[in-house]
Amino acid sequence: MKKDKTERTKQSWRKAQNAPSLSEVNNSVAIPKNAKFFRKLFAFMGPGALIAVGYVDPGNWATSIAGGSEFGYTLLSVILISNILAVLLQSLASKLGIVTGRDLAQASSDHFSKPFGFVLWILAELAIIATDIAEVIGSAIALNLLFGIPLIWGVCITALDIFLVLFLQHKGFRYIEVIVITLMVTILVCFGAEMVMSHPDMQAIAKGFIPQSEIVTNPAMLYIALGILGATVMPHNLYLHSSIVQTRQYARTKEGKKEAIRFSFIDSTFSLTIALLINASILILAAAAFYTTGQHNVAGIEDAYKLLNPTLGSSIASTVFAVALLASGQNSTLTGTLAGQIVMEGFLNIRLKPVVRRLLTRVLAIVPAVIITALYGANGINELLIFSQVILSMQLSFAVIPLVMFTSDKQKMGEFVNPTWLKIISWAVAIFIAVLNIYLLFYTLTSL
C-alpha cells in the first residue's frame, strides 16, 4: 500500500527532475540526528531569516511611513493581518519544497505547458528585477544620506555587493544566513532606538492592532492599507523559500519530512515575527514623529530622514534611520539574487554560472535606476520605487495560485496534502490577494 502511494506521487509529475534546486548548496547544512529539540531547531534556523528580509525591504518602508504619518497608529492592524497571511503562504512554500524536493519554479515548469511556463518565468523575472530595483534605490538613498554620495553613483556602487554574495556562497550557505541575520538585528535595533526617542503613545499602539471600520470606509486609508498588504507578500519569496529549505540534510523519509516541516514552520514564523516588529516600528515611528506633530504628508524615505532630527530633537535619529535603510537594502540584495538563480534554473533548466546570473539580474535593475536618476533625480527615484511595487503586485497571484494548487493536490503531496480546512483558507487568501492586486493596479492606472 505504501509503495502504491509512492508510485502515484511519482507519477503526478510529468518528467523526472534533472537536478536539485540550487544544486551547489542543496543538502549542504548538517542536521544532528540524535540531538535534543533546541539543537535541532538551531540547525534548521536560517532560511526563515532570508525570507523575512523580503518583508522589510525598502519598498515596504514607503507604505509604512505614509500610513503612519497620515493616519497615525490605525493601520497597525493591517500590518498584523499581512504578517498572518505571510506565515500561511511561506509555510505552504516550505512544505512544497520539503515534500516534493522541487521548488515552486520547478513544480510550475513540470505542471504547466511550455508556453505558459515561459510566461510564468517572464513574470517571475520581472518581479525579481522589480524587487532588485527597490533594493538598489534603497541602498543608493542610504549611501547618499550617510556619505553624500550622489544617487547615480550610489546606484552603480550597489553592483559591488554581487561579489559579496558570491564570496559568501563559496564559503557555505550558513555564512549567507549569518550575514542576513546580523543585518536584520541591526535594522531591529535601529528602529527600537528610534521608537524610544519618539516616545510613542502605548495605548494608541495597542488600539492600532485592533481592526477599525474606518480602514474600509475611508478611501484614502483603504488605498494605503491595500498598499501595505500588497507590498508585504513578495512573489520571489515563495520561489526562494521552497528552494532554500532543501539546504538542510534532513532525512528524505516520511518522518524526516514531518520533522523538517515542523522546524521550518517554527523558523519562518519566528523570523516573520521579527519582520512584523520592524514594519510595525516603522509605522509607529512615523505616527509618533510626524502624525502627532501635524506632518501628515511625508512623501518618501528622504523626507522622513530630513524630518527626524528636528522632530525627535536628537542629532543621531536620522543617521540611525539611514543605517537601517542601508542594512535593509543590502539584506534584500543577498536574497533577491538567489531567487533569480532559482527561477531561471527551475523554469528553463538553464544553469548559468552564479556570477553571470547575478550580474544579469543586477544590470537589469541598475539600468532603469541610472536612467531615471540621471533624467529626473530624487523625485524620479521615488516614482520608480512606487512603480516597482506595482509590478510586484501584478505578479503575486501567478506565484500564489500555483502554490495553493500544488500543495492541495494529493497526487503531488501524498499524505502531506493540505487538509480541507487549510485548502479553504488557502484558496480564500489566494482569491483575496488576486482581487486586492487587481484593485491596486486599476487604482494606480486610473490615477496616472
From Swiss-Prot:
Q: Which Pfam families match?
A: Nramp
Positions with biased composition (Basic and acidic residues): 1-10
Provide the topology term for how it sits in the membrane: Multi-pass membrane protein
Q: Where is this region: Disordered?
A: 1-20
Q: Which residues cross the membrane?
A: 41-61, 69-89, 117-137, 147-167, 176-196, 215-235, 270-290, 307-327, 363-383, 384-404, 424-444
The processes (GO biological process) annotated in the record are: iron ion transmembrane transport; manganese ion transport
Which NCBIfam families does this chain map to?
nramp (TIGR01197), Nramp_1 (NF037982), PRK00701.1 (NF001923)
Q: What does this protein do?
A: H(+)-stimulated, divalent metal cation uptake system.
Q: Which family does it belong to?
A: Belongs to the NRAMP family.
Q: What is this protein called?
A: Divalent metal cation transporter MntH
Organism of origin: Listeria monocytogenes serovar 1/2a (strain ATCC BAA-679 / EGD-e)
